[in-house]
Amino acid sequence: MAYSCAVQAASPAPLSAPRELTPRGIALGIALALILGAANAYLGLYAGLTVSASIPAAVISMALLRMAGGATILENNLVQAIASAGEAVAAGSIFTFPALIILGHKGPLPYLQVTALSAAGGTMGALLVVFLRRAYIVDDRLPFPEGFACAEVLRAGENRSQMAPLAWGGAIAAGLKAAQDVFGIVPGMISGARWLGGAVIGGSINISGALLGIGYIVGLRIATLVFAGGAFAWMVAIPVLALLHGGGQNPDPMRAASALWSSQVRYLGVGAMLTGGIVTLWRLRKRIFAALRDSLAIVSGSHVQVVAREETDLSPRAIVSAVGLTVPVIFTLCLMLGAGVALSAALALMLALIGFFATAIAGYLTGIVGASNNPVSGVTVIVLLAVAIFLKLAGVESVGVGPRLAILSGAVVCTAAAMAGDSLHDLATGYFVGATPRALEIGVLIGAIAASFVMAPILNLLIAGYGIAGTATSRAGALAAPQAFLIAKVTQAVFRGGLPWTTIASGAMLAALLAAGDVLAERFGSSWRAPIMPVAIGLYLPFGLSVTIFIGALTGGWLGQEKEGGPRLLFAAGMVAGEALMGVATGALVTAGVSLPVL
């Protein structure tokens, strides 16, 4: 089912013998992957979010390669693809490995385990999505808002006439971000809540140029569904739970509402994403099976297919071989952690299978809300639940060994999910500018492997320098690591009890009802459709993000459609780019020891 959105994928511009995968581009991409990966590791531990590195890397690449001379748009695109892989590996690492510290791990994080598991997850995520590229980008035409924005930045670098609206949008969003994070004179969010009898009702709005731009790019239909999920969470679920569970015990209504959201309502989104992932894979089953069938035929040598450069992927034989190497790596590490041979083998195979499921979900979500807003932690919670339950059924009851095995196993799939979203985002950018998928797939894999080798030292430096709040490592200015705390909490809850299974099941049932309604609407030819995933995202993400995305989409609906590359779309893309650049710059200032805000 194709999405109707503000932006539709353009046909890639054919180029003959393009200058794309070059030694200097690879070297620059790796350097940026390490730098931006480190910056995002800090941001993720500090604030629980990461910024897509694609646009900052594209801007840096255009500036440096222009000075060197002879650069092409495809070479710059390849650089940003390699660089953004470092950010994706950082996202997977910061959400999981610090959870070991929270659970009581002493000393530095083990280099071999972090490196091997990050590399295994990065390889899975970078390559498994090759089988989904055509289904998501070409056939379903998901908007990939940040992929579109990055493509517009690259095009503007080639065509200076497009630079003005892009620059204005970027300057306004960057200025707003600086006013918030650097100078502290503008709030990043406005929120409020009030008691209505025993119920509490509240809401928030994020003040963000990037989110407004994303809303404009994805269009009113998708943004409305995301907003509907958030509105249901805050206007229905939270008030009802407050009535049932006595939310009035907390005198501050906003604190009470936020506590209910984080401890209960957010798990509605987890359940909904689980059902949504299953439904999405079921709907795409024919396309996926066709891609796998053709791939197996190519591997066996019984089928040879000639395709255009813009449709050339890595060979299925290479993909199967590379992903296959991750299985013995995971098996060996599980053995080292004390699991038996049978359990280690079962875990390795299970993670390979779950890896494809997680990459499919994460890639789809990125296509809707962009790489920066991809709810990787939600996908990781689903994986952790599956792994932890499997370990309990296998007899691993120890609250020490069980959670550790679950977290390290989940780290593989978490990194794969983050990498999948990034990889499809890069492939979407490549589709918009006429790049070769095969070159991008190689580049993303290079960036993922390179970043994996430095993740353990980066994490250990940050933990040694700042510590993690609420643990034995904590000190002044300790890192909050909110996603790692979520992962640790969920894992412990499976082994010790206390996970809100009823809420998770309710989210899954709600999504099933939506799916049934969508099937009926399709059968009767209705133009009203409600796919699950956008609603699930709204249930899981903070409401303020959904509200701002919705406002951006409303603005686009009010102004009306415009042709691809129009000034308003360029302005929206510039807002996404400007905030991303300022976010990285702010992270660099904080990492350098500058105390923010300065006022």
Where are these regions (language model features)?
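Alpha-helical multipass membrane-protein architecture
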Residues: 2-599
